[in-house]
Amino acid sequence: MADEIADDEPKPLGRCSVFTYGVGHMLNDITSACWYTYLLLYLTDIGLSPSNAATVTLTGQFADALTTIIAGELIDRFGHFKIWHGMGCLLVALSFTSLFGGCLPCKILGSDSPAVKTVGYCISAVIFCSGWSCTQISHMSMVNGVTLNPTSRVACVSCRNAFTMIASLILYAVAFFVFNKKTSSSQVDIKNQYQMMAYISIFIGAVFVIIFQLGTKEPSLKQESDGKRATATWTYWFKKVLYYQVLSIYVLTRVATNVSQTFLAVYVINDLRMSPSSKALIPATIYLSSFIASVLLQELKWSGERLKAFFSAGGLLWLFCGAAVIFLPINMNAFMYVLSVLIGIANALMMVTAIGMESELVDKHLDGSAFVYGSLGFLDKVLCGVFLYFLESYESADPVACDPAYPCFSVTRFSLGFVPGISALIGVVIAFFIKFHTSHPKPLTEPLLA
Protein backbone atom coordinates (compact mmCIF):
# COMPACT_ATOMS: atom_id res chain seq x y z
CA MET A 1 0.00 0.00 0.00
CA ALA A 2 2.86 2.35 0.84
CA ASP A 3 4.45 1.63 -2.54
CA GLU A 4 1.20 2.55 -4.32
CA ILE A 5 1.03 5.89 -2.52
CA ALA A 6 4.67 6.56 -3.34
CA ASP A 7 4.02 5.80 -7.01
CA ASP A 8 1.17 8.32 -7.06
CA GLU A 9 3.40 11.15 -5.80
CA PRO A 10 4.91 13.39 -8.48
CA LYS A 11 8.44 12.33 -9.32
CA PRO A 12 11.26 14.79 -8.69
CA LEU A 13 13.08 16.37 -11.61
CA GLY A 14 16.58 15.43 -12.71
CA ARG A 15 19.58 17.72 -12.70
CA CYS A 16 19.48 18.55 -16.42
CA SER A 17 15.81 19.62 -16.40
CA VAL A 18 16.34 21.90 -13.42
CA PHE A 19 19.44 23.41 -15.05
CA THR A 20 17.80 24.20 -18.39
CA TYR A 21 14.83 25.78 -16.61
CA GLY A 22 17.01 27.71 -14.19
CA VAL A 23 19.05 29.48 -16.89
CA GLY A 24 15.96 30.74 -18.74
CA HIS A 25 15.89 34.05 -16.88
CA MET A 26 19.56 34.95 -17.35
CA LEU A 27 19.01 37.69 -19.96
CA ASN A 28 16.38 39.30 -17.76
CA ASP A 29 18.64 38.99 -14.72
CA ILE A 30 21.77 40.51 -16.20
CA THR A 31 19.88 43.45 -17.71
CA SER A 32 17.81 43.92 -14.56
CA ALA A 33 20.96 44.11 -12.44
CA CYS A 34 22.21 46.90 -14.69
CA TRP A 35 18.83 48.67 -14.58
CA TYR A 36 18.55 48.75 -10.80
CA THR A 37 22.23 49.27 -10.00
CA TYR A 38 23.40 51.75 -12.63
CA LEU A 39 20.41 53.46 -14.27
CA LEU A 40 20.20 56.26 -11.70
CA LEU A 41 23.95 56.89 -11.86
CA TYR A 42 23.98 56.71 -15.66
CA LEU A 43 21.11 59.13 -16.22
CA THR A 44 22.47 61.71 -13.77
CA ASP A 45 25.99 61.32 -15.22
CA ILE A 46 24.74 62.23 -18.70
CA GLY A 47 22.97 65.34 -17.45
CA LEU A 48 19.45 64.40 -16.35
CA SER A 49 18.25 65.75 -13.01
CA PRO A 50 17.37 63.25 -10.25
CA SER A 51 13.65 64.03 -10.74
CA ASN A 52 13.84 63.35 -14.51
CA ALA A 53 15.79 60.15 -13.85
CA ALA A 54 13.06 59.14 -11.38
CA THR A 55 10.45 59.80 -14.10
CA VAL A 56 12.23 57.39 -16.46
CA THR A 57 12.30 54.72 -13.74
CA LEU A 58 8.63 55.21 -12.83
CA THR A 59 7.54 55.07 -16.48
CA GLY A 60 9.36 51.78 -16.94
CA GLN A 61 7.94 50.32 -13.74
CA PHE A 62 4.35 51.15 -14.73
CA ALA A 63 4.84 49.73 -18.23
CA ASP A 64 6.28 46.61 -16.61
CA ALA A 65 3.32 46.34 -14.24
CA LEU A 66 0.69 46.80 -16.96
CA THR A 67 2.33 44.28 -19.29
CA THR A 68 2.59 41.82 -16.42
CA ILE A 69 -1.19 41.71 -16.02
CA ILE A 70 -1.86 41.55 -19.77
CA ALA A 71 0.75 38.84 -20.39
CA GLY A 72 -0.47 36.81 -17.42
CA GLU A 73 -4.07 36.82 -18.66
CA LEU A 74 -3.12 35.94 -22.26
CA ILE A 75 -0.77 33.14 -21.18
CA ASP A 76 -3.52 31.64 -19.01
CA ARG A 77 -5.95 31.74 -21.96
CA PHE A 78 -3.71 30.59 -24.81
CA GLY A 79 -0.59 29.02 -23.27
CA HIS A 80 2.61 28.97 -25.37
CA PHE A 81 4.96 29.86 -22.51
CA LYS A 82 8.10 29.55 -24.63
CA ILE A 83 6.80 31.83 -27.38
CA TRP A 84 6.04 34.56 -24.84
CA HIS A 85 9.45 33.99 -23.31
CA GLY A 86 11.24 34.33 -26.65
CA MET A 87 9.26 37.41 -27.67
CA GLY A 88 10.06 39.11 -24.36
CA CYS A 89 13.77 38.32 -24.66
CA LEU A 90 13.84 39.84 -28.16
CA LEU A 91 12.31 43.11 -26.91
CA VAL A 92 14.75 43.23 -23.99
CA ALA A 93 17.76 42.75 -26.26
CA LEU A 94 16.65 45.38 -28.79
CA SER A 95 15.80 48.07 -26.25
CA PHE A 96 18.63 47.60 -23.76
CA THR A 97 21.36 49.06 -25.96
CA SER A 98 19.18 52.10 -26.65
CA LEU A 99 18.49 52.55 -22.95
CA PHE A 100 22.15 52.45 -21.96
CA GLY A 101 23.71 53.45 -25.25
CA GLY A 102 22.18 56.83 -26.01
CA CYS A 103 18.92 58.64 -26.66
CA LEU A 104 17.56 57.62 -30.09
CA PRO A 105 14.91 60.41 -30.32
CA CYS A 106 17.66 62.91 -29.46
CA LYS A 107 19.63 61.78 -32.50
CA ILE A 108 16.54 61.85 -34.75
CA LEU A 109 15.43 65.32 -33.62
CA GLY A 110 18.96 66.69 -33.26
CA SER A 111 18.24 67.94 -29.74
CA ASP A 112 19.85 67.21 -26.36
CA SER A 113 17.38 69.17 -24.25
CA PRO A 114 16.38 67.61 -20.90
CA ALA A 115 12.77 67.18 -22.07
CA VAL A 116 13.74 65.29 -25.24
CA LYS A 117 16.23 63.18 -23.30
CA THR A 118 13.66 62.29 -20.68
CA VAL A 119 11.03 61.33 -23.28
CA GLY A 120 13.60 59.33 -25.27
CA TYR A 121 14.76 57.31 -22.32
CA CYS A 122 11.16 56.81 -21.19
CA ILE A 123 10.34 55.21 -24.56
CA SER A 124 13.33 52.85 -24.26
CA ALA A 125 12.33 52.06 -20.67
CA VAL A 126 8.76 51.19 -21.72
CA ILE A 127 9.93 48.76 -24.43
CA PHE A 128 12.58 47.22 -22.18
CA CYS A 129 10.27 46.72 -19.19
CA SER A 130 7.41 45.37 -21.33
CA GLY A 131 9.67 42.72 -22.83
CA TRP A 132 11.15 42.00 -19.42
CA SER A 133 7.73 41.30 -17.88
CA CYS A 134 6.72 38.96 -20.73
CA THR A 135 9.84 36.89 -20.11
CA GLN A 136 9.43 36.97 -16.34
CA ILE A 137 5.78 35.89 -16.16
CA SER A 138 6.10 33.15 -18.78
CA HIS A 139 9.18 31.74 -17.04
CA MET A 140 7.83 31.92 -13.48
CA SER A 141 4.43 30.46 -14.31
CA MET A 142 6.02 27.52 -16.15
CA VAL A 143 7.44 25.97 -12.99
CA ASN A 144 4.18 24.35 -11.85
CA GLY A 145 3.77 22.85 -15.32
CA VAL A 146 7.36 21.60 -15.40
CA THR A 147 6.92 19.66 -12.12
CA LEU A 148 4.24 19.06 -9.47
CA ASN A 149 6.78 17.86 -6.90
CA PRO A 150 6.93 20.57 -4.17
CA THR A 151 10.62 20.06 -3.42
CA SER A 152 11.54 20.06 -7.12
CA ARG A 153 9.57 23.28 -7.59
CA VAL A 154 11.58 24.98 -4.87
CA ALA A 155 14.73 23.47 -6.40
CA CYS A 156 13.83 25.05 -9.76
CA VAL A 157 13.25 28.39 -8.05
CA SER A 158 16.51 28.03 -6.13
CA CYS A 159 18.39 27.14 -9.33
CA ARG A 160 16.86 30.14 -11.07
CA ASN A 161 17.86 32.34 -8.13
CA ALA A 162 21.39 30.92 -8.23
CA PHE A 163 21.70 31.85 -11.90
CA THR A 164 20.28 35.27 -11.09
CA MET A 165 23.28 35.69 -8.83
CA ILE A 166 25.60 34.39 -11.54
CA ALA A 167 24.13 36.87 -14.02
CA SER A 168 24.63 39.73 -11.59
CA LEU A 169 28.20 38.64 -10.83
CA ILE A 170 28.93 38.56 -14.55
CA LEU A 171 27.53 42.05 -14.91
CA TYR A 172 29.61 43.40 -12.04
CA ALA A 173 32.73 41.73 -13.41
CA VAL A 174 32.08 43.44 -16.74
CA ALA A 175 31.34 46.71 -14.92
CA PHE A 176 34.57 46.44 -12.93
CA PHE A 177 36.51 46.04 -16.17
CA VAL A 178 34.65 48.87 -17.93
CA PHE A 179 34.74 51.40 -15.09
CA ASN A 180 38.44 50.83 -14.36
CA LYS A 181 39.49 51.77 -17.89
CA LYS A 182 41.04 55.22 -17.96
CA THR A 183 38.74 57.55 -19.86
CA SER A 184 37.71 61.15 -19.61
CA SER A 185 34.54 62.17 -17.78
CA SER A 186 32.78 63.45 -20.91
CA GLN A 187 29.24 62.29 -21.65
CA VAL A 188 30.44 60.56 -24.84
CA ASP A 189 32.92 58.41 -22.93
CA ILE A 190 30.36 57.63 -20.25
CA LYS A 191 27.86 56.50 -22.90
CA ASN A 192 30.56 54.36 -24.56
CA GLN A 193 31.30 52.62 -21.27
CA TYR A 194 27.67 51.74 -20.66
CA GLN A 195 27.10 50.74 -24.28
CA MET A 196 30.01 48.30 -24.10
CA MET A 197 28.53 46.84 -20.92
CA ALA A 198 25.11 46.54 -22.62
CA TYR A 199 26.46 44.67 -25.67
CA ILE A 200 28.41 42.18 -23.56
CA SER A 201 25.43 41.61 -21.27
CA ILE A 202 23.04 40.93 -24.15
CA PHE A 203 25.43 38.47 -25.81
CA ILE A 204 25.90 36.45 -22.61
CA GLY A 205 22.18 36.47 -21.81
CA ALA A 206 21.27 35.37 -25.34
CA VAL A 207 23.43 32.24 -25.03
CA PHE A 208 21.43 31.09 -22.00
CA VAL A 209 18.12 31.94 -23.68
CA ILE A 210 19.05 29.49 -26.44
CA ILE A 211 19.89 26.79 -23.85
CA PHE A 212 16.53 27.28 -22.18
CA GLN A 213 14.54 27.24 -25.43
CA LEU A 214 16.24 24.07 -26.65
CA GLY A 215 16.33 22.20 -23.33
CA THR A 216 12.95 22.96 -21.73
CA LYS A 217 9.74 21.35 -22.92
CA GLU A 218 6.57 23.39 -23.33
CA PRO A 219 4.24 22.40 -20.45
CA SER A 220 1.08 20.60 -21.57
CA LEU A 221 -1.87 22.12 -19.70
CA LYS A 222 -5.44 20.83 -19.55
CA GLN A 223 -8.10 21.83 -22.06
CA GLU A 224 -11.87 21.75 -22.19
CA SER A 225 -13.71 19.30 -24.46
CA ASP A 226 -14.10 21.99 -27.11
CA GLY A 227 -10.33 22.47 -27.28
CA LYS A 228 -10.20 25.76 -25.39
CA ARG A 229 -7.89 26.29 -22.43
CA ALA A 230 -9.46 25.82 -18.99
CA THR A 231 -8.68 28.83 -16.80
CA ALA A 232 -9.47 29.61 -13.19
CA THR A 233 -11.42 32.81 -12.72
CA TRP A 234 -9.87 35.78 -10.94
CA THR A 235 -12.52 35.54 -8.22
CA TYR A 236 -11.28 32.04 -7.34
CA TRP A 237 -7.98 33.52 -6.19
CA PHE A 238 -9.52 36.66 -4.68
CA LYS A 239 -11.54 34.49 -2.29
CA LYS A 240 -8.43 32.79 -0.88
CA VAL A 241 -6.84 34.35 2.21
CA LEU A 242 -3.58 32.61 1.29
CA TYR A 243 -3.48 34.60 -1.96
CA TYR A 244 -3.35 37.92 -0.10
CA GLN A 245 -0.79 36.63 2.39
CA VAL A 246 1.56 35.35 -0.29
CA LEU A 247 0.98 38.51 -2.33
CA SER A 248 2.04 40.69 0.62
CA ILE A 249 5.15 38.63 1.30
CA TYR A 250 6.25 38.59 -2.35
CA VAL A 251 5.69 42.33 -2.85
CA LEU A 252 7.51 43.23 0.36
CA THR A 253 10.41 40.98 -0.63
CA ARG A 254 10.68 42.70 -4.00
CA VAL A 255 10.56 46.13 -2.37
CA ALA A 256 13.43 45.12 -0.07
CA THR A 257 15.63 43.72 -2.85
CA ASN A 258 14.86 46.24 -5.62
CA VAL A 259 15.01 49.41 -3.52
CA SER A 260 18.25 48.32 -1.86
CA GLN A 261 19.83 47.41 -5.20
CA THR A 262 18.86 50.76 -6.73
CA PHE A 263 20.50 52.87 -4.02
CA LEU A 264 23.49 50.65 -3.26
CA ALA A 265 25.92 52.16 -5.77
CA VAL A 266 24.97 55.73 -4.80
CA TYR A 267 25.34 54.83 -1.11
CA VAL A 268 28.87 53.44 -1.34
CA ILE A 269 30.08 56.35 -3.50
CA ASN A 270 28.30 59.36 -2.01
CA ASP A 271 27.65 58.34 1.59
CA LEU A 272 30.61 56.09 2.39
CA ARG A 273 33.12 57.83 0.05
CA MET A 274 34.45 54.49 -1.21
CA SER A 275 36.50 54.08 -4.42
CA PRO A 276 34.75 53.95 -7.82
CA SER A 277 35.49 50.22 -8.10
CA SER A 278 33.37 49.61 -4.99
CA LYS A 279 30.18 50.23 -7.00
CA ALA A 280 31.03 46.93 -8.71
CA LEU A 281 32.76 45.08 -5.85
CA ILE A 282 30.09 45.64 -3.19
CA PRO A 283 27.16 44.42 -5.37
CA ALA A 284 29.35 41.51 -6.56
CA THR A 285 29.95 40.49 -2.93
CA ILE A 286 26.20 40.55 -2.27
CA TYR A 287 25.45 38.37 -5.25
CA LEU A 288 28.27 35.94 -4.59
CA SER A 289 27.04 35.25 -1.05
CA SER A 290 23.47 35.05 -2.36
CA PHE A 291 24.54 32.54 -5.00
CA ILE A 292 26.20 30.30 -2.42
CA ALA A 293 23.13 30.49 -0.17
CA SER A 294 20.84 29.62 -3.12
CA VAL A 295 22.90 26.54 -4.00
CA LEU A 296 22.73 25.34 -0.40
CA LEU A 297 18.99 25.99 -0.17
CA GLN A 298 18.16 23.76 -3.11
CA GLU A 299 19.60 20.71 -1.35
CA LEU A 300 17.09 20.95 1.52
CA LYS A 301 13.80 19.10 1.88
CA TRP A 302 10.99 21.63 1.67
CA SER A 303 7.56 22.04 3.26
CA GLY A 304 5.30 24.99 3.93
CA GLU A 305 6.60 25.37 7.49
CA ARG A 306 10.20 25.41 6.32
CA LEU A 307 9.40 28.07 3.74
CA LYS A 308 8.01 30.23 6.54
CA ALA A 309 10.96 29.58 8.86
CA PHE A 310 13.66 30.36 6.31
CA PHE A 311 11.81 33.44 5.07
CA SER A 312 11.59 34.74 8.63
CA ALA A 313 15.31 34.15 9.17
CA GLY A 314 16.08 36.16 6.02
CA GLY A 315 13.72 38.96 7.00
CA LEU A 316 15.22 39.37 10.47
CA LEU A 317 18.73 39.31 9.00
CA TRP A 318 17.72 42.12 6.59
CA LEU A 319 16.36 44.10 9.53
CA PHE A 320 19.76 43.92 11.22
CA CYS A 321 21.56 44.89 8.00
CA GLY A 322 19.22 47.83 7.43
CA ALA A 323 19.96 49.21 10.90
CA ALA A 324 23.71 48.81 10.31
CA VAL A 325 23.48 50.65 6.96
CA ILE A 326 21.75 53.61 8.59
CA PHE A 327 24.35 54.04 11.33
CA LEU A 328 27.54 53.14 9.43
CA PRO A 329 30.01 56.11 9.42
CA ILE A 330 32.52 56.88 6.66
CA ASN A 331 35.57 55.86 8.70
CA MET A 332 34.12 52.35 9.06
CA ASN A 333 33.18 51.91 5.39
CA ALA A 334 35.24 48.69 5.10
CA PHE A 335 32.54 47.05 7.27
CA MET A 336 30.25 47.39 4.24
CA TYR A 337 31.89 44.26 2.80
CA VAL A 338 30.75 42.26 5.85
CA LEU A 339 27.26 43.72 5.51
CA SER A 340 27.29 42.79 1.82
CA VAL A 341 27.73 39.11 2.70
CA LEU A 342 24.83 39.24 5.17
CA ILE A 343 22.59 41.16 2.75
CA GLY A 344 23.28 38.55 0.06
CA ILE A 345 22.28 35.71 2.39
CA ALA A 346 19.14 37.59 3.47
CA ASN A 347 18.16 38.26 -0.16
CA ALA A 348 18.54 34.57 -1.07
CA LEU A 349 16.54 33.36 1.93
CA MET A 350 13.70 35.79 1.27
CA MET A 351 13.54 35.52 -2.52
CA VAL A 352 13.75 31.73 -2.82
CA THR A 353 11.13 31.16 -0.12
CA ALA A 354 8.82 33.95 -1.31
CA ILE A 355 8.68 32.47 -4.83
CA GLY A 356 8.38 29.02 -3.27
CA MET A 357 5.29 30.27 -1.44
CA GLU A 358 3.85 31.34 -4.79
CA SER A 359 4.28 27.77 -6.04
CA GLU A 360 2.61 26.46 -2.90
CA LEU A 361 -0.31 28.83 -3.54
CA VAL A 362 -0.74 27.70 -7.15
CA ASP A 363 -0.07 24.01 -6.29
CA LYS A 364 -1.94 21.96 -8.94
CA HIS A 365 -4.05 24.83 -10.30
CA LEU A 366 -1.92 25.23 -13.42
CA ASP A 367 -4.80 26.79 -15.35
CA GLY A 368 -4.48 30.03 -13.37
CA SER A 369 -0.77 30.09 -12.60
CA ALA A 370 0.09 32.97 -14.94
CA PHE A 371 -2.59 35.17 -13.35
CA VAL A 372 -1.17 34.54 -9.87
CA TYR A 373 2.38 35.34 -10.92
CA GLY A 374 1.18 38.24 -13.06
CA SER A 375 -1.00 39.86 -10.42
CA LEU A 376 1.72 39.60 -7.78
CA GLY A 377 4.22 40.99 -10.24
CA PHE A 378 1.87 43.85 -11.11
CA LEU A 379 1.58 45.04 -7.52
CA ASP A 380 5.29 44.52 -6.94
CA LYS A 381 6.23 46.74 -9.87
CA VAL A 382 3.68 49.46 -9.13
CA LEU A 383 4.73 49.69 -5.50
CA CYS A 384 8.45 49.56 -6.30
CA GLY A 385 7.96 52.19 -8.99
CA VAL A 386 6.18 54.56 -6.62
CA PHE A 387 8.78 54.03 -3.91
CA LEU A 388 11.68 54.59 -6.30
CA TYR A 389 10.08 57.67 -7.86
CA PHE A 390 9.62 59.50 -4.58
CA LEU A 391 12.92 58.39 -3.10
CA GLU A 392 14.93 59.23 -6.23
CA SER A 393 13.15 62.60 -6.61
CA TYR A 394 14.65 63.69 -3.30
CA GLU A 395 18.03 62.12 -3.99
CA SER A 396 21.07 64.43 -4.31
CA ALA A 397 23.37 63.90 -7.27
CA ASP A 398 26.37 65.12 -5.24
CA PRO A 399 27.83 63.92 -1.92
CA VAL A 400 26.79 65.94 1.12
CA ALA A 401 29.24 67.31 3.67
CA CYS A 402 29.64 64.86 6.54
CA ASP A 403 31.81 64.17 9.58
CA PRO A 404 33.64 60.86 8.84
CA ALA A 405 33.07 59.68 12.42
CA TYR A 406 29.28 60.04 12.27
CA PRO A 407 26.65 58.79 9.80
CA CYS A 408 24.96 61.31 7.50
CA PHE A 409 21.22 60.71 7.47
CA SER A 410 20.63 61.19 3.76
CA VAL A 411 17.79 60.00 1.54
CA THR A 412 20.14 57.30 0.28
CA ARG A 413 20.72 55.89 3.76
CA PHE A 414 16.99 55.95 4.46
CA SER A 415 16.26 54.21 1.14
CA LEU A 416 18.92 51.52 1.51
CA GLY A 417 18.49 50.84 5.23
CA PHE A 418 15.07 51.75 6.58
CA VAL A 419 12.76 50.87 3.65
CA PRO A 420 14.09 47.31 3.03
CA GLY A 421 14.45 46.61 6.75
CA ILE A 422 10.88 47.58 7.61
CA SER A 423 9.53 45.75 4.54
CA ALA A 424 11.33 42.60 5.67
CA LEU A 425 9.96 42.95 9.20
CA ILE A 426 6.36 43.30 8.01
CA GLY A 427 6.88 40.24 5.79
CA VAL A 428 8.04 38.19 8.78
CA VAL A 429 4.92 39.16 10.75
CA ILE A 430 2.64 38.11 7.86
CA ALA A 431 4.53 34.82 7.37
CA PHE A 432 3.84 33.89 11.00
CA PHE A 433 0.10 33.62 10.27
CA ILE A 434 0.30 31.68 6.97
CA LYS A 435 -0.98 28.10 6.82
CA PHE A 436 0.09 25.89 3.89
CA HIS A 437 -1.36 22.54 2.84
CA THR A 438 1.92 20.62 2.60
CA SER A 439 3.34 19.73 5.99
CA HIS A 440 5.85 16.97 5.19
CA PRO A 441 9.01 17.66 3.17
CA LYS A 442 9.53 15.48 0.09
CA PRO A 443 13.15 14.58 -0.72
CA LEU A 444 14.96 14.87 -4.01
CA THR A 445 16.64 11.90 -5.63
CA GLU A 446 19.88 13.72 -6.54
CA PRO A 447 21.66 17.04 -6.00
CA LEU A 448 20.81 19.62 -8.64
CA LEU A 449 23.76 21.97 -8.94
CA ALA A 450 26.55 19.67 -7.75
For the regions a language model picked out, list residue spans one by one.
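Membrane-embedded alpha-helical bundles of multi-pass transporters/translocases
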Residues: 2-450
